[in-house]
């Protein structure tokens, strides 16, 4: 069973309050999502491997640690996931960025992939899928499928707000994928929106309706 990590850091929760607020404008909403993504990236990379090297400081020779060269890629689910990418790249600027686009089939209501652009060395990379919302989990499950069928072996999913239904969907379909969230909300309403949620993340990020 995949693990669920809820980040209750005071800064994350403070910023999340204003992300939820319907009176927060597009510019501030975008900035807050970016900032929370950076804070979450700090936590999600806690287990990155390091190795010891020797350097010369202005005072002496010293042994210290650096990242051991693990390849990492960030994959936003279009379009709202784009709003979280730069926040992660601030901490991991060398990470590659892929993209996965999905639409909902009007008859089956299931997500269908319409776009996928990923680094060439998929099998060698660890992946972090980012999307502000985890509602029904359909898009997340399909995005993970998309990476796995191309050879990805180590995948994490990161979002701002999740509904229990979405968490359950990932755990049932991809028990090897851990989930990192800023808040686990109450439920989905009859329209599939997370309650209390934050509305439509894509519209609020890009100023559309």
UniProtKB/Swiss-Prot annotation:
Keywords per UniProt: Allosteric enzyme, Glycosyltransferase, GTP-binding, Magnesium, Nucleotide-binding, Transferase
Chain residues that bind 5-phospho-alpha-D-ribose 1-diphosphate: 79, 104, 131-139, 200
EC number: 2.4.2.9
Cofactor binding mode and count: Binds 1 Mg(2+) ion per subunit. The magnesium is bound as Mg-PRPP.
Keyword Magnesium in record: yes
Binding site for uracil: 194, 199-201
Molecular function GO labels: GTP binding; magnesium ion binding; uracil phosphoribosyltransferase activity
Substrates-to-products reaction catalysed: UMP + diphosphate = 5-phospho-alpha-D-ribose 1-diphosphate + uracil
One GO BP annotation of this record: UMP salvage
Pathway: Pyrimidine metabolism; UMP biosynthesis via salvage pathway; UMP from uracil: step 1/1
SUPFAM superfamilies on file: PRTase-like
Function statement: Catalyzes the conversion of uracil and 5-phospho-alpha-D-ribose 1-diphosphate (PRPP) to UMP and diphosphate.
Family per similarity comment: Belongs to the UPRTase family.
PANTHER family linked: ADENINE PHOSPHORIBOSYLTRANSFERASE, URACIL PHOSPHORIBOSYLTRANSFERASE, CHLOROPLASTIC
Protein name: Uracil phosphoribosyltransferase
Provenance organism: Lysinibacillus sphaericus (strain C3-41)
Gene name in the database record: upp
